[in-house]
Amino acid sequence: MPRYEIVDTGEVKETDLSEIEEIPPDLNIRAVDEALGTEEVGVKIWYFEPGEEIGYHAHAEQEELYYVLDGEFSLKIGTSGDEEYVEVGPGTFWVAGPETGHGHRYVGDDRGAVLAIGAPFVEDPGLDPHSLDED
């Protein structure tokens, strides 16, 4: 029998990460993956106020896909020394594979939101893209 879950975004608790010392950045999120009980993929909705950002970083194993739900963002994406800067808005997707630097700053006027999906769903803390060796 297939295993499935259904959840409405409004049913997923919004968490203020500034209240959790071990987890930067100080943004608000909805941990959709926790509400659904996913095991293979991480799913979060990140909320941004003007000027807030997720700094430029990379992951050793995880590929991350993003989708802009609301607002305008300035992306920094690509290999260290060869980054691109791109302005994106609602309806835009972008993806960063393992060891690919990526970060984004909210440049909109109202609250912004991004859906972030990462796989594999492993403990994969952010790496400094400038310290990664190129093959």
Task: Provide a role label for each language-model segment.
Residues 1-40, 55, 126-135:
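A short, N-terminal "cap"/entry segment at the start of jelly-roll beta-barrel domains
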Residues 33-35, 54-60, 77, 85-86, ...:
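Short histidine-centered beta-strand/loop micro-motifs
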Residues 28-31, 44-60, 98:
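Conserved short histidine dyad/triad with adjacent acidic residue
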Residues 53-55, 74, 92-94, 98-104:
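Histidine-centered metal-chelating micro-motifs
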Residues 3, 103-135:
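Double-stranded beta-helix
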Residues 79-99:
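Short acidic-glycine-tyrosine-enriched beta hairpin
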Residues 47-49, 60-79, 117-120:
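Short, conserved beta-strand element in jelly-roll/cupin
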